[in-house]
Amino acid sequence: MSKYQINCIRYRHFLRTSNISQIPDFTKYCIGPVNEELAPYIMETMKAYPSNSEYINPQHYYHNRTVLVENYLKRSPNPVSLTQLAQYYDDSTKLTRTKIINSGKFVKEELVIRIAHKLNQLQQLPFNVVNNFHFVQVYESYYNIFESFRKYPTIRTLEDASQFADFIKNMLEGFNTLNLPHLIMGALECTILDLYPREKMDQLLSDLLRARISRRLIVEEHVSITANYTSGKEENTLVLGDIFQECSAKKYLLEASEESQKFIQDMYFKDIPMPEFIIEGDTQLSFYFLPTHLKYLLGEILRNTYEATMKHYIRKGLEKPEPIIVTVVSNDESYLFRISDKAGGVLHDDENLWSFGKSKERAQESLNNFHKLPGLQTVSIYDEVHSHTKYNSKLKSLQSITLKPYMHTSLEPMSYPSIINGHIKYETPLIELLKRSFRYKLGIGLAMCKVYAEYWNGDLSLHSMPGYGTDVVLKLGNLMKHTKKLQLDKV
């Protein structure tokens, strides 16, 4: 073949693959000419490994291959029931030394396997998705969990199990608390940039969130039974363990209504007329549930309902706001809350309501508000944490640099309660999202609620009549009917 023919082939290949292995033209991304002072930073942002990363480095591929892929990915997670988590196979609510030790062994091994499979799920994503700043934070955090639990010494004694429970609390109260907002911000950014189909992104977040609930449930159950046993308690509450409580539907509805009214007063003014809040149906209903999740679900839904009702009241110039009516219904299998308003119906498309990505315009609006939330700046919390050698010094540095200016104010960062409180709070990030100011419209409330409702064998649906109003129907499964059902990322 002549040199001319070879050059022709090369030229045709260049025309077909002009964007492969070529130096990027950064000028097309700039408003004006390239500033030479910025040139050194291009290498920093384009290099293969993040700065100060404890896990993503030149050795990561080989370590990941030999440890995660060739070892832990060959093991399957164990589906468990609520009964097993509380009883550990001896079919009683009695707390014993053996039960606590077996619980610790199971949690240590199971969490490593489960987080390994989620790491692999992230690794299978397109590079420009998993390389997103927020997904990198989640990946770093997951690998931190994987390595920390994998390397933790074998649990053989009650003292080992007790120390393991303390270790778990430190993990949950540390920098892993920001995984939830980082997951959502990463999804929003990928939607805006067209990096991943919206349907696939919604499924990815749903999978990761359900797995997150399961992991925290397993961990919290072990912390609970260990604390109970070491404090002298001899028996768990019922078969579900003490992290589940008997919840009064009316009490939680009234609390959610009160918080929503405070939200409206903050949004407008203190003495603004409030809609009448009416509870109908099975008003005396009490059922066993995870208190924080019930508070979040009812709070998020009522917050939206109150906001829509008040906007309708002002827009129409009504004499007083229309009432909000909650109908409570129950049977042997499930509990149902129907929240009805007369606020004119929902304006957005149905597909946008249940999506984390939404349209590009709404995704950008949500992302902007996420970035305004105190404690969620785009500076990585992991960079600060990893720059210190001891856990306590990490927390003190974080508090003084990031948290102190907002302490005891309405702008207190979302991460603060989880990081420094002396006792563990289950799903603190959820409640902090719920407490956000009206200024921060995130647009992911219903999508989040649907994932959590489905996890608990329920559902969330919305029925809107344009020009009249909306019914939001929250269904939750009866946990006492599903205590022995084996599931992986669902009850």
Swiss-Prot record:
Histidine kinase domain boundaries: 153-480
Signal sequence interval, chain numbering: none
Assembly, per entry: Interacts with PKP1.
Note: Present with 450 molecules/cell in log phase SD medium.
Keyword Thylakoid: no
Annotated organism of origin: Saccharomyces cerevisiae (strain ATCC 204508 / S288c)
The family this protein is said to belong to: Belongs to the PDK/BCKDK protein kinase family.
Listed name of the protein: [Pyruvate dehydrogenase (acetyl-transferring)] kinase 2, mitochondrial
